Amino acid sequence: MRTLPLGARAFIPVALAGAVLFSLAPSTPAAAATITTEGQQIVQIAKWQLGDPWRYGATGPYAFDCSGLVIYSYKRAGEGAAIRAGSLRSARSIYLYFRSRGKTSRTNPKVGDLVVWGYGSHIGIYIGGGKAISTLRNGVRIHGVFAVTARFTTYIHTGMSTKRVS
């Protein structure tokens, strides 16, 4: 057996250790758990924007206001028609559109439903567990439904929460 001279560096164990670490790494990110509904897909797209800055009127992909994040997430999921993306540009217009069609409720939210605060002054996406994702002044964040300063108004049921991903 050949030994290395004193002070020589051996790179083989380091290379092997690196190979072991890479082989143990998951092939898909843990955050990309199985997505089975359009609502989950919409939430995942919104979560990819976490930390992006707030900018009034911005619709992404690098900055958002509250309705911009909603429109961007729905469009990227292929569901822009669900919120009439383009014709409904503000949180208030989205809220009024769905309210006039009887699609709002203060109970039983589903993942991917919209959350409205202050009668349309702010809007976000329900992610489950009493939490929502929305763009506040400090950027795209996850927060409790009742933690936003504007008063919680309603949930908007867009029908994406149960629509299966094909």
Language-model features and meaning:
Residues 2-7, 11, 26-27, 31-34, ...:
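Aromatic- and glycine-rich peptidoglycan recognition patches
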Residues 13-23:
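Bacterial N-terminal signal peptides
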Residues 24-27, 39:
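Compositionally biased, low-complexity segments enriched in small residues
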Residues 38-42, 46, 66, 70-73:
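Stable alpha-helical elements in mature extracytoplasmic
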Residues 47-51:
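Regular secondary-structure segments
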Residues 52-111, 150-158:
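Catalytic cysteine-centered active-site loop
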